[in-house]
Amino acid sequence: MIDKSGYRANVAIVLLNRQDRVFWGQRKSRTSWQFPQGGVATGETPLQAMYRELYEEVGLRPHDVEVIASTRDWFKYDIPDSLVRSREPVCIGQKQKWFLLRLKTSESNINLEANDSPEFDNWRWVSYWYPINHVVYFKQDVYRRALTYFKEYIN
């Protein structure tokens, strides 16, 4: 769902383990790593989209996690001009509703092949602030904003 300004509605997930380390996924067939994220479908709430993406990308169900917090506002980032597609509707970036979750069940429930088109082919737990400097450059600011927003909920 792309708004009139050219931003695609999206959800992003910060998944914590019991040690407050975060899930960090390597994108399939790429060298880049990121948090789980994905678009909000027409007629879908951000919460519904988050649970759908959580299952599609990480293989976890609602009973596997606790929702700790979500951002009140949508956080935006622009994509580089070289990645903007020329066909309609033009998407210049993403506006994201962020969710902070805690894993309640065993990490053995994480399944990167829960659907037919996996997003990730590898994952690991990393320190809370690690992703800011290791995500693709054009997402660094939005990652910093989200992690700073959620910091008050971390032990």
Swiss-Prot record:
Q: Which InterPro entries match?
A: Nudix_hydrolase, NUDIX_hydrolase-like_dom_sf, NUDIX_hydrolase_CS, NUDIX_hydrolase_dom, RppH
Required co-factor? a divalent metal cation
Ranges where the Nudix hydrolase domain occurs = 6-148
The EC number(s) this enzyme carries: 3.6.1.-
Motif, Nudix box: chain positions: 38-59
Show the GO cellular component annotation of the record. Answer: cytoplasm
Q: Locate the coiled-coil region(s) and give their ranges.
A: none
Top-rank taxon of the source lineage equals Bacteria
**Which GO annotations describe the biological process of this protein?**
mRNA catabolic process
Name the residues that span the membrane. none
Name the Gene Ontology molecular function terms of this record. Answer: mRNA 5'-diphosphatase activity
Keywords on record: Hydrolase
An example of a Pfam family matching this protein is NUDIX
General function of this protein: Accelerates the degradation of transcripts by removing pyrophosphate from the 5'-end of triphosphorylated RNA, leading to a more labile monophosphorylated state that can stimulate subsequent ribonuclease cleavage.
**PANTHER family per the UniProt record, alphabetical:** M7GPPPN-MRNA HYDROLASE
Family classification:
Belongs to the Nudix hydrolase family. RppH subfamily.
The protein's name in its UniProt record? RNA pyrophosphohydrolase
What organism is recorded for this protein? Francisella philomiragia subsp. philomiragia (strain ATCC 25017 / CCUG 19701 / FSC 153 / O#319-036)
State the encoding gene. rppH
